[in-house]
């Protein structure tokens, strides 16, 4: 498969062979990037300093922006949840994130785009062009962190 590191030691971030059956591993890798050591399912991120989410704090194991919770829980869990209900429900967090990732993977055809959309709201090429970042890291670094986690999980899963 193409998930090997290249000679420069850089993490491979291109997954042409990614299959929808690996979406759970993709989700687990995302959880590791977003909240490892940071409080897991009840985590609250730092206050966003700029951009469309200014003043807000991402929540949960996957750092979901609160404004997305009502519509995403309605769509994927079957009932609208408040931020607090969402924080108290690890299963709802897993369901929402897995379905959002799958939806964006199906929409764009590449897992890298689905991960980029998660981080920036945009597919990879657009995010790179816009120099999208969360104030501390940009999308290439985020994708690289995700890839490292994903590759490790894929190895363990064999």
Give the residues covered by each predicted segment.
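N-terminal carbohydrate-binding/catalytic regions of secreted carbohydrate-active enzymes
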Residues: 64
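Acceptor-substrate binding/catalytic loop of class I
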Residues: 61
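Non-catalytic cell-wall polysaccharide-engagement segments
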Residues: 1-55, 67-95, 99-158
